Amino acid sequence: MFCHRLLGYEAHKKSVDWLNFFLLRCLNILGTSFEFSNPFKIPDKGPLIIVSNHQSTYDIPPIIWYFRKHHPKFISKSSLGRGIPSVSYNLRYGGSVLINRKKSVLALQKIKDFGEKVQKNKWAAVIFPEGTRSKDGQPKKFFSKGLMTLFEQIPDATVIALCINNSWKLAQFQYFPIPIGIKVSLEVKSTFKLSEQEPVALFQKLEQLISGGVQKI
């Protein structure tokens, strides 16, 4: 709050980056490890759309840290905008968008406005097309409307297919106790220049790549 109100966006962003770095280090105390794998060249400049499966709230800190130079912003449910120290404030004021899925027309308009902002500022939009997190880690069906809206509003984007494994294990007991020695992995499965892809075919590719990379129980 101090950084945002008194020092502006850049200071706020750096404080969020380092907050999430230290959240990861705190989990290291429990033997939790985070491995990020990316064999692809991601442009240093230009907007991104990061498409990922969703297993727990512990997906968020490594995405923020490992993609920090791209300014990741999230599409999140509105209930997370209150009640979580630091996290809720960042969702409200850090450039992300909060939506109520029950109000679909308004939600899509908010995603449209969010996409325009990402395109203009050359940020990274992070979307979990499953809608809700998978409590057992197994992939759910991808919903297309939100992602297709981002495709329309961020035509210059590089699209990142990101697969997350094992973060669900950190939340399997309702976040307490947190199991010891969990190995969480984030792997970029592929990248696509949006302008070179047909949107529906790209959506199908992304779902196949990401869901296919999730470890089976």
Q: Would you name each region that the model predicts?
A:
Residues 15-26, 30, 90, 146:
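Hydrophobic alpha-helical segments of integral membrane proteins
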Residues 196-217:
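A cross-taxonomic marker for long C-terminal extensions/tails that follow the last structured domain
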Residues 45-47, 70, 121-123, 157-158:
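Short coil/turn segments at beta-strand junctions that form active-site/ligand-binding loops
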Residues 23-48:
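A short, well-structured juxtamembrane/interface segment
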